């Protein structure tokens, strides 16, 4: 296995190649194959970008057929047959059945593009600059999105340029069990001397991913929506990692029965790992002037093709979402048992999440790193998240077979016991 050119030429900023130091050559479903002959079960799935697995045959065929037909690949924001099909499918398969009426902005290929566009739109729509965000939230690393991201590691990488225009509030559960964090927010909103500039919008992940798999409670989300309505603030749901079925519903906010003013999607939106993002907005918020927010790669037709194919194949009825919810219960049960095992061994641990977005909080980053490193040696790829990397994070493909799901969980259990000297 030759890695010299990779180690010599790629920037020190790389991360995943340090955690999983091998050269991958092919992938299918929830399996990755490496150059040295080893294979791995994938509980990372491109950090939530491969909800439908690697190289899903239906999506691969749709893409191959489109390329073979000399279909438009790059067209800026010009109209194409692929874009038309994508928008029609989005409306008919996803939006209308959920009673949602949104216009679509295609801002560029990444999630942070979508967040930048969303917060800029909110500021223009309300004529106010402040965006309320939450502790442990992650919304991207470009300057506008970074201002709403809590992680100090990312915020310190600006070279001294201050991040501005956002105010942080405590997320649900941040202050401990039983503490009503929204009452604090409401108190500031009602106090002209509280120091909080009147917000244009609130941005929220219903389940925080990078922050440690922290699910906001359903009543908490419903109350947050009401606060936004009562105080003339827009509600932005960042569904970049939690969306596209990850929590067991296409949109993660469906569990709470709320209707955001603006939604951002990316990661698994293309269905195939292709770079793609969109912003959904209530029609009356579409106040952009032509070309006011643009980008060279805002019309990636290959992603239109695979995204439309994914929506038709997986979301035309509720069969897929029920299967995701079933698998989520399997992971939840196994993670709870692992948490109990660790706690009994004197190392308190806990499980949390929603759907197939689940975390095992082992208390400290060193322990989590030992377990995930051992899991990699045993044939499982799984990462960590949280303020100190203390949460082992399951983001396996939603399409994973029961055999691979149980196999991956068995490897994780084996790895935990090996770290504790019990194997």
From Swiss-Prot:
Belongs to the class-III pyridoxal-phosphate-dependent aminotransferase family. This is Diaminobutyrate--2-oxoglutarate transaminase. Its EC number is 2.6.1.76. The gene is ectB. One of its GO terms (biological process) is ectoine biosynthetic process. It comes from the Bacteria. Its cofactor is pyridoxal 5'-phosphate. Keywords: Aminotransferase, Pyridoxal phosphate, Transferase. Homohexamer. SUPFAM superfamilies: PLP-dependent transferases (SSF53383). CDD domains: OAT_like (cd00610). InterPro entries: Aminotrans_3 (IPR005814), Aminotrans_3_PPA_site (IPR049704), Dat (IPR004637), Ectoine_EctB (IPR012773), PyrdxlP-dep_Trfase (IPR015424), PyrdxlP-dep_Trfase_major (IPR015421), PyrdxlP-dep_Trfase_small (IPR015422). The keyword Transferase applies. The keyword Acetylation does not apply. GO terms for molecular function: diaminobutyrate-2-oxoglutarate transaminase activity; diaminobutyrate-pyruvate transaminase activity; pyridoxal phosphate binding. Pathway: Amine and polyamine biosynthesis; ectoine biosynthesis; L-ectoine from L-aspartate 4-semialdehyde: step 1/3.
């Amino acid at each position: 296995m030759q890695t010299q050119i990779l180690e010599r030429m790629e920037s020190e900023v790389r991360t995943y190649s340090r955690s999983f130091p091998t050269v991958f050559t092919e992938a299918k479903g929830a399996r990755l194959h490496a150059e040295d002959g080893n294979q791995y079960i994938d509980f990372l799935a491109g950090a939530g970008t491969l909800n439908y697995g690697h190289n899903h045959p239906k999506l691969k065929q749709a893409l191959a057929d489109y390329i073979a037909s000399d279909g438009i690949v790059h067209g800026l924001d010009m109209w194409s047959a692929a874009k038309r099909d994508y928008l029609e499918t989005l409306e008919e398969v996803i939006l209308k059945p959920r009673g949602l009426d949104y216009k679509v902005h295609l801002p560029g290929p990444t999630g942070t593009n979508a967040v930048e566009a969303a917060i800029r739109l909110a500021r223009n729509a309300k004529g106010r600059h402040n965006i309320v965000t939450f502790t442990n939230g992650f919304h991207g690393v470009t300057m506008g999105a970074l201002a709403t991201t809590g992680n100090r590691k990312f915020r310190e990488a600006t070279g001294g340029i201050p991040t501005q225009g956002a105010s942080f509030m405590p997320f649900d559960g941040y202050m401990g069990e039983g503490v009503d964090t929204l009452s604090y927010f409401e108190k500031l909103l009602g106090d002209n001397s509280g120091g909080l500039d009147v917000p244009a919008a609130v941005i929220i992940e219903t389940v925080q991913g990078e922050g440690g798999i922290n699910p906001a409670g359903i009543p908490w989300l419903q109350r947050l929506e009401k606060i936004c309505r009562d105080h003339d603030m827009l509600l932005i749901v960042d569904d970049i990692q939690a969306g596209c079925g990850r929590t067991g519903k296409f949109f993660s906010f469906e569990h709470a029965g709320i209707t955001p003013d603006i939604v951002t999607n990316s990661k698994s939106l293309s269905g195939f790992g292709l770079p793609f993002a969109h912003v959904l907005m209530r029609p009356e918020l579409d106040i952009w002037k032509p070309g006011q927010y643009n980008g060279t790669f805002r019309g990636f037709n290959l992603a239109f093709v695979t995204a439309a194919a994914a929506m038709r194949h997986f979301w035309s009825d509720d069969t897929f979402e029920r299967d995701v919810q079933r698998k989520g219960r399997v992971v939840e049960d196994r993670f709870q048992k692992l948490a109990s095992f660790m706690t009994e061994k004197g190392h308190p641990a806990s499980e949390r999440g929603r759907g197939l977005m689940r975390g095992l909080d082992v208390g400290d980053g060193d322990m989590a790193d030992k377990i995930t490193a051992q899991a990699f040696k045993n044939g499982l790829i799984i990462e960590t998240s949280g303020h100190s990397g203390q949460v082992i994070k399951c983001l396996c493909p939603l399409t994973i077979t029961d055999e691979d799901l149980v196999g991956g969980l068995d490897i994780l259990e084996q790895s935990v016991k090996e770290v504790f000297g019990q194997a």
